Amino acid sequence: MEILMKSGDLNKYDLVKNALVLVLAGGRGSRLHELTDKRAKPALYFGGNRRIIDFALSNCINSDLNRIGVVTQYAAHSLLLHLQTGWSFLPQERGEFVDMLPARQQIDDSTWYRGTADAVYQNMAIIKNHYRPKYILILAGDHIYKQDYSVMLMDHVNSGAKCTVGCIEVPRSEAHEFGVMAVNENLKVKAFVEKPKDPPAMVGKPDVSLASMGIYVFDADYLYKMLEQEVNTPQTSHDFGKDVLPKCLEEGALYAHPFSRSCMGRNTEGEIYWRDVGTLDSFWQSNIDLVSENPQLDIYDQSWPIRGNPIQAYPSKFFYKHSNVHPVDNSLIGGGCVITDASISNSVLFDHIKIDAFSKVDHCVVLPQVKIGKNCVLKNCIIDRECEIPDGMQIGVDMEEDKKRFRISSTGKVILVTSKMLKILEGHEIGEEGHLD
C-alpha cells in the first residue's frame, strides 16, 4: 500500500491497520525496591483498581491501534495473568490482538533480553513473518499518561522520518534521567544524548530540557536494518536510547514529536500529564494526587477511558456506630472493602481491604487484600498487597522507629510496608531472602 506524504491524503485507518505496537514491559523498576520484588513494574497497581500497563494499552485501543505485542521478561506471572484476564477481548478474526511475547532465549541458549533494542531484535522473526507491519510503534509499559498514538503516527509519515521519538519538556534539574535532544524548526533532531550528567537546555528556556519519552515510531524496514547493525556493533548496550537513536541521528532520519500535539485529557489550566512512577516517592505522590477535587489526571474521563481487569468485586461497605469517628474524606475506595469505625483521609484504597475500629489512615496507598487491625495509625505509607497490620500498630508517627522496621523513601517522607517486613517483626522464619537491607 502506498502512503502519500501530504497530510490531506493520509488515511488514519490505513495507517493504524498497517502498524504494530510493541509495549516493552519487562523491566523490574529497582528503585521501587520491595514493591517490584515479585512483579514487573508495569504490573504494579495504580489508581485504586488499575495496573500501570493499563495506561499504555488503553492509549493503544483509544488510538485505534489494535495490533499489540507485549514484551515481557522479569517476574512476569502477575503481568501475564492480568493480560489474560483483562486484555483478551479484541477479535482476533479481525486481525486484532494483545499478544504476549515473553523472553524465550530465541537467539541462543544463554541470552535473555539484554536491553530494549535486543528485546525487539529477538522477536524480529515473528514481527516480520507473522505480523508484517509497515510501521512499528515502540513504547514503555511503565508510564502514566494519556496519548493519541495515531497523531504521532500521522506526524511520522507526514515528516518523511524513518524514526520519530516522542518528547516532552522537563525541568533541566531532572533531565539527567532521560535522553535529551535538540531540534530545529521542523522538529528534525539535531543532537541527542542519553542521560547526560549536565543536560543541555532548550533555546530560550535555560531551566528546561527536551526529553525523550521512550516512545518511538519506526518505518518497519528501517528498524530491521538498524537492529541488524546494532546487534553486530562491538560494546553495544542493546538499548534504543544509547545505541539505536544516535545511529538514526547520524543518518539524518530522526525526528521529534512533541507530546503536547497528541496529549489527551489536559487539566483546566491546559497542563499536560506524564509521569514516570519509578520511585517510591513518585509512585506514592502520583496516587495521592488522584484524590484532589480536580486532579491533573482524570481517571473518570469517558472520552478516553483507562480500561483494566473487568472482574467485579462486591460493593464496599462502611459501618459507623460512633459519632466521634471522622469518616472517609478525599479518598478513592476500591471494591469489596469493609470499613468499620475507621477514619480514612487523602488515601487510595484498592480492592478487598478490611479496616477495623478506631484506626486512622492518612495519605496512604493501600494495595489489595490488606487487613488493618483496631486502633492503628498509618500516615504517608505504601502498604503492599496482603499485609496484615496488627492492632495498635503506628507507622509514620515516629520516623526513627520506622527506619528500623520498614523501607523509607529517598526523601524520607514515604514508608513502604510489606508482608515480609511484618513477619520479620513478628519473629517468623521466612528464609534468607526475607532479610531487610
Swiss-Prot record:
<dbReference type="Pfam" id="PF24894">
    <property type="entry name" value="Hexapep_GlmU"/>
</dbReference>
<keyword id="KW-0808">Transferase</keyword>
<dbReference type="InterPro" id="IPR023049">
    <property type="entry name" value="GlgC_bac"/>
</dbReference>
<comment type="pathway">
    <text>Glycan biosynthesis; glycogen biosynthesis.</text>
</comment>
<feature type="binding site">
    <location>
        <begin position="194"/>
        <end position="195"/>
    </location>
    <ligand>
        <name>alpha-D-glucose 1-phosphate</name>
    </ligand>
</feature>
<keyword id="KW-0119">Carbohydrate metabolism</keyword>
<keyword id="KW-0548">Nucleotidyltransferase</keyword>
<dbReference type="InterPro" id="IPR056818">
    <property type="entry name" value="GlmU/GlgC-like_hexapep"/>
</dbReference>
<feature type="binding site">
    <location>
        <position position="212"/>
    </location>
    <ligand>
        <name>alpha-D-glucose 1-phosphate</name>
    </ligand>
</feature>
<dbReference type="InterPro" id="IPR011004">
    <property type="entry name" value="Trimer_LpxA-like_sf"/>
</dbReference>
<comment type="function">
    <text>Involved in the biosynthesis of ADP-glucose, a building block required for the elongation reactions to produce glycogen. Catalyzes the reaction between ATP and alpha-D-glucose 1-phosphate (G1P) to produce pyrophosphate and ADP-Glc.</text>
</comment>
<protein>
    <recommendedName>
        <fullName>Glucose-1-phosphate adenylyltransferase</fullName>
        <ecNumber>2.7.7.27</ecNumber>
    </recommendedName>
</protein>
<comment type="subunit">
    <text>Homotetramer.</text>
</comment>
<dbReference type="Pfam" id="PF00483">
    <property type="entry name" value="NTP_transferase"/>
</dbReference>
<dbReference type="InterPro" id="IPR005836">
    <property type="entry name" value="ADP_Glu_pyroP_CS"/>
</dbReference>
<dbReference type="GO" id="GO:0008878">
    <property type="term" value="F:glucose-1-phosphate adenylyltransferase activity"/>
</dbReference>
<keyword id="KW-0320">Glycogen biosynthesis</keyword>
<feature type="binding site">
    <location>
        <position position="179"/>
    </location>
    <ligand>
        <name>alpha-D-glucose 1-phosphate</name>
    </ligand>
</feature>
<keyword id="KW-0547">Nucleotide-binding</keyword>
<keyword id="KW-0067">ATP-binding</keyword>
<dbReference type="InterPro" id="IPR029044">
    <property type="entry name" value="Nucleotide-diphossugar_trans"/>
</dbReference>
<keyword id="KW-0321">Glycogen metabolism</keyword>
<feature type="binding site">
    <location>
        <position position="113"/>
    </location>
    <ligand>
        <name>alpha-D-glucose 1-phosphate</name>
    </ligand>
</feature>
<dbReference type="InterPro" id="IPR011831">
    <property type="entry name" value="ADP-Glc_PPase"/>
</dbReference>
<dbReference type="GO" id="GO:0005524">
    <property type="term" value="F:ATP binding"/>
</dbReference>
<dbReference type="InterPro" id="IPR005835">
    <property type="entry name" value="NTP_transferase_dom"/>
</dbReference>
<dbReference type="GO" id="GO:0005978">
    <property type="term" value="P:glycogen biosynthetic process"/>
</dbReference>
<comment type="similarity">
    <text>Belongs to the bacterial/plant glucose-1-phosphate adenylyltransferase family.</text>
</comment>
